[in-house]
């Protein structure tokens, strides 16, 4: 929806947990030989609807992860989570990666793979069905998953945007 801002300003009272999605060793070939560095994709979230992702690059693995966490903290988004699942089905595409997220009943667990699982667990979703198609590149999967979650709307948000009551959203 146009005009909806889900950005979150970071404050000290938000306790964020970070998850490492992928780490990659990168080689730069120079006249003097090979230079190695590392890139890390990190997802941070408070497991209550706030999520962010970041990319860190450095000569050491720990420094790359730390830079990724700092980058993720600057890129936070709020996502609606209802009773441990998502409000409705949603799909999104980023690059060659396409994701499909569907709500699940209590006790199902997080049925998702790789990078999608890290994002969904960080946002606080405990029961969801998710499928990725196309590219399995973790960069694109993380971005597509966060894009799909960012497009989610619960009944309260819809009522607020339309200027009507929550009951009227359901009854028409």
Curated annotation (Swiss-Prot):
Pfam families: Ribosomal_S5 (PF00333), Ribosomal_S5_C (PF03719). Residues 16-79 form the S5 DRBM domain. GO terms for biological process: translation. One of its GO terms (cellular component) is small ribosomal subunit. InterPro entries: Ribosomal_Su5_D2-typ_SF (IPR020568), Ribosomal_uS5 (IPR000851), Ribosomal_uS5_bac-type (IPR005712), Ribosomal_uS5_C (IPR005324), Ribosomal_uS5_N (IPR013810), Ribosomal_uS5_N_CS (IPR018192), Ribsml_uS5_D2-typ_fold_subgr (IPR014721). SUPFAM superfamilies: dsRNA-binding domain-like (SSF54768), Ribosomal protein S5 domain 2-like (SSF54211). GO terms for molecular function: rRNA binding; structural constituent of ribosome. Keywords: Ribonucleoprotein, Ribosomal protein, RNA-binding, rRNA-binding. The N-terminal domain interacts with the head of the 30S subunit; the C-terminal domain interacts with the body and contacts protein S4. The interaction surface between S4 and S5 is involved in control of translational fidelity. HAMAP family: Ribosomal_uS5_B. PANTHER family: MITOCHONDRIAL RIBOSOMAL PROTEIN S5 (PTHR48277:SF1). NCBIfam families: rpsE_bact. Belongs to the universal ribosomal protein uS5 family. With S4 and S12 plays an important role in translational accuracy. Part of the 30S ribosomal subunit. Contacts proteins S4 and S8. This is Small ribosomal subunit protein uS5. It comes from Bacteroides fragilis (strain ATCC 25285 / DSM 2151 / CCUG 4856 / JCM 11019 / LMG 10263 / NCTC 9343 / Onslow / VPI 2553 / EN-2).
